[in-house]
Amino acid sequence: IKYFCSSPEKFKVNKKFDVILNMEIVEHVEDIQFFLKCCSKLLKKNGIMFIATINKTLKSYVFAIIGAEYVLRWLPIGTHEWEKFVKPEDLKNILKSNNLFLNKLDGMHFNLIKDEWNISKDTSVNYIAEFLKN
């Protein structure tokens, strides 16, 4: 297994990959459509792209920005911009235009008492999506 940590816009290689992981990234990029287009070009046919990100809801604003940045101080203030959060449906549409189709969508929930993340059906704050390239 080879891992590459690079921006897809700057990644210059004549290879395509079986799997691309975009974990907690897309809510920070300047141009999500261009970023995902570049990622899709790096993915082989029948490849899988995983995207973990934050939904664009009032609840996500309260939990991911007010809670995580201001109250719990898990992250520096200003780490997230709510305007860059992305709804699953919007992500699905962007990737559909790049020949990737949603295969699975799950919510992710942090349990403060157990100090652990769990998969859930609630996608209103954090979620992870699996897309397949056609």
Features from the language model and the residues they span:
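Conserved SAM-binding loop
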Residues: I1-Y61, P88-L91, A129-K133
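Short, flexible, mixed-charge acidic loops at enzyme active sites
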Residues: S60-Y70
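Residue-level marker for beta-strand->alpha-helix junctions and adjacent short loops that shape enzyme
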Residues: K56, F110-L112
